[in-house]
């Protein structure tokens, strides 16, 4: 049976607005830092501004690299395309796939990642799951909870029921 489907991540209006507003604020701050950098003479201030510009750049590249763009599932496994890079979860490593809602996560705490900029992406933690990787661009959509032998993933997906049904039917 040939199984290969692809869906795009759908952003909620909250994620869209958070991303737009934060991008504008960061861009204005970045322009201000660069403008101040160009017009600053004392070496100590130039060094401090250089460090701030470098840190802001690294944080922005990291935040953007986490943003998921599409999800593909096939007989080999589940593939998450991101703006920079991708994640592959092989079928053989998947122990279970279930459909959950965001409310079932009981307000997970962010350990390292984005709390709304481009989605809720990165490492999160809650009492029930422990540490897990989350790629959620819409808290109101159904979520896939994928558990492997060493990791847990929570992924927003409009096709969560279909993916769960197909993988569970394949006797994983």
What is the predicted role of each segment?
Residues 144, 150-172:
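Non-cytosolic head/periplasmic domains of membrane-anchored proteins
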Residues 27, 53-57:
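Hydrophobic alpha-helical membrane-embedded or membrane-associated segments
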Residues 1-6, 74-78, 143:
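Short, hydrophobic/aromatic-rich segments at coil-to-beta transitions
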Residues 31, 48-50, 138:
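Short hydrophobic/aromatic-rich motifs at helix boundaries and adjacent loops
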Residues 1-44, 151:
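N-terminal membrane-targeting/pre-transmembrane regions
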Residues 56-98:
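Conserved beta-hairpin
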Residues 41-53:
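Hydrophobic alpha-helical transmembrane segments
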Residues 10-13, 81-149:
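Non-transmembrane, membrane-adjacent beta-strand/coil modules in membrane-associated proteins
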């Amino acid at each position: 049976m040939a199984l290969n489907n692809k869906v795009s991540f759908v952003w909620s209006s909250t994620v869209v607005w958070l991303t737009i507003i934060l991008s504008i604020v960061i861009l204005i701050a970045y322009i201000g830092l660069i403008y101040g950098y160009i017009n600053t003479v004392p070496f100590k201030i130039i060094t401090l501004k250089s460090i701030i510009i470098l840190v802001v750049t690294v944080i922005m590249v990291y935040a953007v690299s986490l943003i998921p763009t599409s999800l593909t599932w096939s007989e080999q496994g589940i593939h998450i395309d991101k703006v920079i890079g991708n994640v592959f979860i092989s079928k053989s490593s998947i122990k279970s796939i279930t459909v959950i809602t965001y409310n079932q996560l009981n307000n997970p705490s962010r350990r390292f990642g984005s709390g709304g900029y481009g989605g809720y992406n990165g490492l999160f933690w809650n009492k029930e799951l422990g540490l897990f990787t989350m790629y959620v661009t819409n808290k109101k959509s159904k979520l896939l909870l994928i558990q492997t032998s060493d990791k847990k993933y929570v992924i927003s997906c409009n096709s969560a029921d279909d993916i769960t049904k197909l993988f569970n039917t394949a006797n994983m």
